Amino acid sequence: ERTVVVFAGDGDFLMHGQEFATAVQYRLPIIVVLLDNGMYGTIRMHQEREYPHRVSGTALQNPDFAAYAQAFGGHGERVERTEDFAPALERLRAQAQATRLPVLLHCLIDPEAITPGRSSTSAAART
């Protein structure tokens, strides 16, 4: 048996988040790490590159994803600081193993931080 970890962006999860209910139903102790930057980041990056300063329809009004997970019967936590990530992940990993239920770690991240050393603005620039 292996630990399954799912990494999803907020826009991605909003399109298929109801699958969390299926994971609860079948008691699948998966770990969902949800990265919330409040936007459809990839779409925004392409818009910035092709139509500078004319971004449209990429901002998201997100729910409390930890509460969303709990509403389905799973477990969830929200972190806002990097130093809180590892302890929260370990707590949720232990909880998933103990309860045989899915868990979700809702991570609020900087919308500009898309990858180490690169911002969404620099990634959108043509090189």
Task: Please tell me what each predicted stretch does.
Residues 1-127:
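Thiamine diphosphate
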